[in-house]
Amino acid sequence: MATLFHLIDVHGNEYQNVQDHSLQMALEELNQQIEVIQRQEEQLALRKKAIEDARQEVLQQIQHRKFRQYLHEREQEARLQEYYLEQLQERRAFENVVRTIIRKRFEDEERERAHRREKAARKLLRRILVSDSPNMQLVVPNNFQQMFIHHPVVDTIYSPEESSESQAEVADQQTGPYSTSEYAGAQQSQPFRIFIQNDNAPEQQSGPDVAELNTLPNRSKTSSQASVSDEELSRTELAELNDYLLAAQRRSNKRGNARKHIDLTARESPSTSFAQMSKGALNPDPEVIEPEDEPTTFRNPLEALLSTGQYSVVSSDEDVESVRDPDDGTLPIHSTQTVEEPIDTKAGEKLTDSSKQPSPPVAEHFSNETFSASPKGAETDVKSEGSNNHEQGSFNEPKSNVDSNDSASPKRPSSQASLRHNVTVEEVPDEDA
């Protein structure tokens, strides 16, 4: 029966039974659905591609915009840096100009200050010195070189081989009140001496500005021997030492007066005018030392005492005890208050005694001996016309007390103001001649 019935579909496919035909129809439907799905996938792929292209374009636009903004910021930063660099260069150029002007002004002020300091030092040292000699030596205290002993120039000046010769010379030169046991320590080391430049010469003259040092002190040098020799310092060494001295003075003068802070010597400071002058040389301040009213020329102390009108010089053979004048501690002169004697005996001695000349002028340095160097062993006797007032008594001190109290001058009694003293210089003609 199978051969009698043939199943033929629309397309001409021949089937043997119905199940085969139904399966074939289901397969065709599935194929159609697959085709529809494939077409949808193609459409979705196209849409996806379009979306991706749009997205990439938008991202590229965003990147371009950011890059343009970055470039703009970099250009602005570069312009700001150029502007700031120009401003900094202008400011530095202005600062350099101002700094150059200020430096030149400071150099000018320092030069003027150094010039004024040199002029003040020269003026002060001219005022301190007694004589106008070009080789005048100013003797400062003994350990003055300890302030700048570490300077290399000082080591060459104060060498050990020169110390023995300098000590022998200093021992010969030490005379007068400085030869006592109080100043025996001055011969232990070489004193520091400063040679003052002659101010009468023009300023263009070669030589140090403020002072020059001499290694071997010798008071008997002439002006021809005071010239610069090979043993003395050179110009550069003098300038270096001058700067070092100014720096030492500036360091010592930081907290005020240098005399209050520097202990120059271990011994007690003497009260003489020469030692005070030496102290004043350590602090050359023009405001400290007032200008002198009297001229600086040296006067004979005997003439100075006679010009006061309180003493009179007469000739006598009688030994009168000497009393040191309280105004001048270095000159041993006889006091006006002598031991009481009758007036007629004094007149008799004046008539019988031969004329004696007064003592010769005293040298610059006095010795501690009594003033008894007149010819024929005569002594200068100072009389007082008020000796007849017995109620006022005698104010003469013993000679032992005067010698013991040599450093401190005795006080004058209060009742001396009531005495009147007149100058009576009497010269009796020489009868023997």
From Swiss-Prot:
- List of residues that carry Phosphoserine: 227, 229, 269, 409, 415, 418
What residue spans carry the Basic and acidic residues bias annotation? Answer: 343-353
Is-annotated flag, keyword DNA damage? no
What keyword terms does UniProt attach to this protein?
Phosphoprotein
Show the segment(s) annotated as Disordered. Answer: 159-184, 200-234, 252-433
**Which ranges are annotated Polar residues under compositional bias?**
172-184, 215-228, 385-421
GO cellular component annotations, sorted alphabetically? cytosol
Q: What is this protein called?
A: Protein slt1
